């Protein structure tokens, strides 16, 4: 399954039909079985009552949960998440993080989460790979990474402004700029 950053719901399909889509496209299940499975998946993400709504009628957090229900529609062994917490309010963010962990445990699946949200990821992850400049910069349990003395890891986890990842884009000195040398 795959949950993209903005959910990628089909705007012309209802919540129900968005979740049913992979079942209809990739299985030979009858409509009654699909109905039951879709309602179970929507119930798992707290949206069974929203089955009849269109994507334009639900919030961004709800849309993300519909996309999550669609991602688990076929009970995949691997679920990939692209920035699942981006743009969510604090309540939706917490709910989504808890749902990812609970569904992962219930389905006995493996999740790959690409994100910059350290706190939420560390709360639900068993093992983390940190990527910097296209390479694995560090790996380990959240606890191990929190104890890391590696400068990149320390800066990223603690949201520090100073470290190997520069905040300022390279430029001439500020003195040169105000001295009239730079435009």
What are these regions (language model features)?
Residues 31-49:
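Conserved ABC ATPase "signature" region
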Residues 54-58, 62:
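Conserved ABC ATPase signature
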Residues 75:
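Conserved catalytic motifs of ABC-family nucleotide-binding domains
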Residues 79-82:
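Catalytic Walker B motif of ABC-type/P-loop ATPase nucleotide-binding domains
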Residues 121-123:
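A short, surface-exposed alpha-helical micro-motif characterized by mixed small hydrophobic
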Residues 139-140:
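ABC ATPase "signature
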């Amino acid at each position: 399954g795959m949950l993209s950053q903005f959910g990628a719901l089909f705007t012309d399909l209802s919540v129900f039909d968005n979740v049913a889509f992979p079942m209809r496209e990739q299985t030979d299940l009858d409509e009654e079985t699909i109905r039951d499975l879709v309602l179970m998946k929507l119930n798992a993400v707290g949206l069974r009552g929203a089955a009849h709504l269109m994507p334009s009628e639900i919030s961004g957090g709800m849309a993300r949960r519909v996309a999550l229900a669609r991602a688990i529609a076929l009970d995949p062994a691997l679920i990939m998440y692209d920035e699942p917490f981006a743009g969510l309010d604090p309540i939706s963010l917490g709910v989504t993080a808890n749902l990812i962990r609970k569904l992962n445990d219930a389905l006995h699946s493996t999740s790959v989460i690409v994100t910059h949200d350290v706190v939420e990821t560390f709360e639900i992850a068993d093992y983390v790979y940190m990527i910097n400049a296209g390479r694995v910069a560090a790996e380990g349990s959240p606890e191990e990474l929190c104890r890391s003395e590696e400068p990149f890891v320390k800066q990223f986890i603690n949201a520090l402004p100073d470290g190997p990842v520069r905040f300022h884009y390279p430029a001439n000195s500020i003195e040169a700029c105000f001295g009239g040398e730079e435009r």
